[in-house]
Amino acid sequence: MMFEKTLSILKPDVVERGIIGRVLSYIEAAGLRIVAQRMCALSHEQAEAFYAVHKARPFFPSLVGFMTSGPVVVQVLVGESAVKTYRDVMGATNPSEAAPGTIRGDLAESIDANCVHGSDSLENAEWEIKFFFKEHEIMSSMPNGK
């Protein structure tokens, strides 16, 4: 088995609506384990730095505005093929295109308030995890704690 780490962000809409537990149930049902987690409020500068890859895109200002509109929950998830597994459980970016049974298909309200962010590659996962967590803040990466 190939265990990987990926980053998850539960966006401000999830925190505001009080559905953190519901989102976590999808993550756990997919066989992913949370090995680091914290709630924080992103500054404008942090959000711009984190989403810098989208800086030239027309949605960048609204993305930064949304991500700084309230607290978020950042997590490191681990599991077999974690990047792909989490992207599958998140569903399509646009909730109207997301399959039922996915986080976005079941819970998201709009393309902006789409509940979650997940790393899109192993390379980005590594960078994104380091953006939010120091190595000592991440528990054992093996699902059985070994």
UniProtKB/Swiss-Prot annotation:
UniProt-annotated location(s): Cytoplasm
Name used for this protein in its record: Nucleoside diphosphate kinase
Superkingdom field: Bacteria
Quaternary structure note: Homotetramer.
Keyword annotations: ATP-binding, Cytoplasm, Kinase, Magnesium, Metal-binding, Nucleotide metabolism, Nucleotide-binding, Phosphoprotein, Transferase
Cofactors (names): Mg(2+)
Source species of the chain: Anaplasma marginale (strain Florida)
Molecular functions per Gene Ontology: ATP binding; metal ion binding; nucleoside diphosphate kinase activity
